[in-house]
Curated annotation (Swiss-Prot):
Pfam families: Methyltransf_4. This is tRNA (guanine-N(7)-)-methyltransferase. GO terms for cellular component: tRNA methyltransferase complex. It is an enzyme of class 2 (transferase). It comes from Lactococcus lactis subsp. lactis (strain IL1403). Belongs to the class I-like SAM-binding methyltransferase superfamily. TrmB family.
């Protein structure tokens, strides 16, 4: 998500150090201490303006959530929502998603969300896609055994690429939606991102998948 630079965003994050973790590497292997409990931890890589992560946290107080984004202004808008909702189970990190293993110990995370990631459509940018094999290796490292990735996008090309990438990596595709918003059974539990709300209003198809890592043979 690209947004204009927000005046005072840096100061805002610094003033809310109880939510935005200034030095996340300090908590590697100790995130339960940061949250003050041993609840499962889910992370969203590329959290945008925070509608999804705060919505999930409100619905599931029994789960801890970490919102991750590398854009200062974007994360400040997500912080707005977290402050307004007063959610004790949300933390935030201003870091690059490619470096997750620097901040989380092996097996420390239970689930990864990838929502409306940049599709990087040009072939020379394939390695930047968040479902490229090097990213999958990082997720596998920080996730518990058989940990899961939940992925949503409006981009058919990225979705098809991701299906192949995950399958080639040896992941099990548990569920696949080719038109998520037509699934009335799933609708009550679907928390939408800002992009998803906008695309849904325009009638665009939303794709979704759930996949898990399998034990190495």
């Amino acid at each position: 998500m690209r947004v204009r630079n927000r005046k005072g965003a840096g100061e805002m994050l610094a003033e809310n150090a109880h939510i935005v973790v200034e030095n996340p590497a300090d908590f590697k292997g100790r995130w339960s201490e940061r949250f003050g409990n041993d609840h499962p931890i889910h992370i969203e890589v590329g959290c945008g303006k925070g509608a999804f992560i705060t919505g999930m946290a409100a619905l599931h107080p029994e789960i801890n959530y970490i919102a991750i984004d590398m854009q200062l202004s974007v994360l400040s808008y997500a912080l707005d929502k977290a402050i307004e909702a007063d959610l004790p189970n949300v933390q935030m990190m201003l870091v690059d998603g490619a470096a997750l293993s620097e901040y989380f110990a092996d097996g420390e995370i239970d689930q990864v969300y990838l929502n409306f990631s940049d599709p990087w459509p040009k072939g020379r940018h394939e390695k930047r896609r968040l479902t490229y094999k090097s990213f999958l290796a990082t997720y596998e490292k920080i996730l518990r055994p058989e940990g899961e990735i939940h992925f949503k996008t409006d981009n058919r090309g990225l979705f098809e690429y991701s299906l192949v990438s995950l399958a080639n990596y040896g992941m099990e595709l548990k569920k696949v939606w080719l038109d998520l918003h037509q699934d009335e059974e799933f609708a009550p539990q679907n928390v939408m991102t800002e992009y998803e709300q906008k695309f849904s209003q325009k009638g665009q198809v939303i794709y979704r998948l759930e996949a898990k890592f399998l034990p190495k043979k």
